[in-house]
Design a protein with these regions (language model features):
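Short, C-terminally biased terminal segments at protein or domain edges
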Residues: 1-99
Length: 99
């Protein structure tokens, strides 16, 4: 999607931010797999969660400014909502089991 927007010479600042935050989610989840302990694991998942919130923001901004259509926006919004809920659930489970 970012490549399509840029190819049409429509926007670059927002799509760069979207690409950065969106890829950071996966990078932090991957990094959490190699955490040095539970605190580090939780920290990486919390960073991924924050990046997910940021990605949702950039998507909303691209939609509200007309750079992406509703047919592009809605499925992505749903996917990132699902990812966010999974991260929240995982964080809460680890914290609960750590007590």
């Amino acid at each position: 999607m970012c490549r399509d927007i840029k190819a049409n010479a429509r926007e670059s600042v927002l799509t760069n931010q979207l690409l950065r935050s969106g890829t950071s989610i996966g990078a932090n989840i991957h990094e959490a797999q190699y955490a040095q302990g539970k605190k580090d694991f939780i920290s990486k998942l919390e960073i991924a969660q924050k990046e997910c919130f940021e990605t949702e923001y950039w998507l909303e901004l691209l939609f509200e400014t007309g750079y992406i259509s509703e047919t592009v926006y809605k499925p992505l919004q749903n996917q990132f909502g699902t990812i966010r809920r999974m991260l929240i659930s995982s964080i809460n489970t680890v914290k609960k089991n750590d007590k």
